[in-house]
Curated annotation (Swiss-Prot):
Superkingdom: Bacteria
Localization per Swiss-Prot or TrEMBL: Cell inner membrane
Name of the gene encoding the protein in the UniProt record: atpA
The enzyme's E.C. designation: 7.1.2.2
Organism: Mesorhizobium japonicum (strain LMG 29417 / CECT 9101 / MAFF 303099)
Residues of the site described as Required for activity: S370
Gene Ontology annotations for the cellular component aspect, listed alphabetically: plasma membrane; proton-transporting ATP synthase complex
Cystine connections: none
Cited function: Produces ATP from ADP in the presence of a proton gradient across the membrane. The alpha chain is a regulatory subunit.
Residues holding ATP: G169, D170, R171, Q172, T173, G174, K175, T176
Molecular-function annotations in GO: ADP binding; ATP binding; proton-transporting ATP synthase activity, rotational mechanism
Name used for this protein in its record: ATP synthase subunit alpha
Lineage: Bacteria, Pseudomonadati, Pseudomonadota, Alphaproteobacteria, Hyphomicrobiales
Main location: membrane
Coiled coil: none
């Protein structure tokens, strides 16, 4: 066997060149058991809580339970291809999602992957899904209105930018319809309003049917509202970890706008299903159950999510994130565990009732039980001026209506109150997909509280309102513009508005 010097020197050179090169160390663990979307992993000693880990075949998971001898991992995807003895790799990254304007108009899953078939997302940066909420110093009190376009809400239960207003009610009471109308109502501002007033929308669908989400997206698309909206969908067929994560992912996407001096609205539809998904994960991870078998930290789950909605101060760019969480009750039971939790976290609630819905009062808002704890600071002055009296009148009407059932001979004052109340209730009805601008609402409610409806039969109120709006949009356009610009009803403007309504009332028959 002949030894060539050149070959030996080549081998030596190669070994010298690679001397001291570190091998890439990736920390791995082994699957001990897997089932129900949960894997128990041995190893991964230095894994962080909430860190992404990778299973064979590219399936991802998140380390949630860090125990003495193993790690409990929830799996984002099907667990049927994972088996005992499989290798699990750390990624070193806490769960994050893409953020930025590139997401507008898209439908994504809880990890920010597109699911609408429109190609990859053009996002520039990624942010962690679970970050700390802003403290007390960065915040500012809520003072700008977030218009929903619904008279019953904007007049009586006003929502401000940076507020958290709960939408609560039984199934099929129109909770999603309120969210949808609020999103559609932002179209006019996006089309011709100033940049600083635009409101970007994020809609998080948790545990809903795919057909429902597809229908929701279709309506947004047809009405031109998808271009300023992001849809995060974790449907009923998605694993529980995805349903648990979706609200946090959506919140991170909304925070991008808040932190860059813009305004965003996020709705979680609905948080009851997120709590159920979290309960499922917690029980499978063998965490101790509490009331209604929910884990002890289910309050913290929702509070840390909803506290991220905030109005930031001037130094941080004046941005805001408004949250409209949805909770579904069973048989109008607001005193169950999750509803009471979320009511205590939010700044008010819009309470929807089945009876009202079937009576044809839609949106089915129970004005007596609904509150906004931010209140009139989230209204323009003009709306305060006209809506101040309507709340009192409706409260008196409800009280009197209860008594009126017992007695037939009512004095004239009571009769007047009942007449006015029934007409105001009629006035607050509104069909779906017809949100009104604030100045139009002011004109309509002004007519209601100043007695223009008192002589009309109740079934003519809707017709009168429709006619009045058409008249104001044509002949009274300058009055509406003045209300929008001045944001208050001066004596002069009040007289002009009165004159326009008088002119219309004469022609109405």
């Amino acid at each position: 066997m002949d030894i060539r010097a050149a070959e030996i020197s080549a081998i030596l050179k190669d070994q010298i060149k690679n001397f001291g090169r570190e091998a890439e160390v990736s920390e791995v663990g082994q699957v001990l058991s897997v089932g129900d979307g949960i894997a128990r992993v041995y190893g991964l000693d230095n894994v962080q809580a909430g860190e992404m880990v990778e299973f064979p075949g590219g399936i991802r998971g998140m380390a949630l339970n860090l125990e003495a001898d193993n790690v409990g991992v929830v799996i984002f995807g099907a667990d049927r291809d994972i088996k005992e003895g499989d290798t699990v790799k750390r990624t070193g990254a806490i769960v994050d999602v893409p953020v930025g304007p590139g997401l507008l108009g898209r439908v994504v899953d809880a990890l920010g992957n597109p699911i609408d078939g429109k190609g990859p997302i053009k996002a520039t940066e990624r942010k962690r899904v679970d970050v700390k909420a802003p403290g007390i110093i960065p915040r500012k009190s809520v003072h700008e209105p977030m218009s929903t376009g619904l008279k019953a809400i904007d007049a009586l239960i006003p929502v401000g930018r940076g507020q958290r207003e709960l939408v609560i009610g039984d199934r099929q009471t129109g909770k999603t319809a309120i969210i949808l109308d609020t999103m559609l109502n932002q179209k006019s501002v996006h089309d011709n309003g100033p940049e600083k007033e635009k409101l970007y929308c994020v809609y998080v669908a948790v545990g809903q049917k795919r057909s429902t989400v597809a229908q929701f997206v279709k309506v947004l698309e047809e009405r031109g509202a998808l271009e300023y909206s992001i849809i995060v969908a974790a449907t009923a067929s998605d694993p529980a970890p995805m349903q648990f994560l979706a609200p946090f992912a959506g919140c991170t996407m909304g925070e991008y706008f808040r932190d860059n001096g813009m305004h965003a609205l996020i709705s979680y539809d609905d948080l009851s299903k997120q709590a159920v998904a979290y309960r499922q994960m917690s029980l499978l991870l063998r965490r101790p159950p509490g009331r209604e078998a929910y884990p002890g930290d289910v309050f913290y789950l929702h509070s840390r999510l909803l506290e991220r909605a905030a109005k930031l101060n001037d130094d941080l760019g004046n941005g805001s994130l408004t949250a409209l969480p949805v909770i579904e009750t069973q048989a109008n039971d607001v005193s169950a565990y999750i509803p009471t939790n979320v009511i205590s976290i939010t700044d008010g609630q819009i309470f929807l009732e089945t009876n009202l819905f079937f009576q044809g009062i839609r949106p089915a808002v129970n004005v007596g039980l609904s509150v906004s704890r931010v209140g009139s600071s989230a209204q323009i002055k003009a709306m305060k001026q006209v809506a101040g009296s309507i709340k009192g009148e409706l409260a008196q009407y409800r009280e009197m209506a209860a008594f009126a059932q017992f007695g037939s001979d009512l004095d004239a004052a009571t009769q007047r109150l009942l007449n006015r109340g029934s007409r105001l209730t009629e006035l607050l009805k509104q069909p779906q997909f017809s949100p009104l601008k604030t100045e139009e609402q002011v004109a309509v409610i002004f007519a209601g509280v100043n007695g223009y409806l008192d002589k009309l039969p109740v079934n003519q109120v809707g017709k009168f309102e429709h006619g009045l709006l058409s008249h104001m949009r044509a002949a009274g356009k300058d009055v509406l513009d003045a209300i929008r610009k001045e944001k208050a009803l001066s004596d002069d403007l009040r007289a002009k508005l009165k004159a326009e309504i008088d002119a219309f009332a004469k022609t109405f028959a």
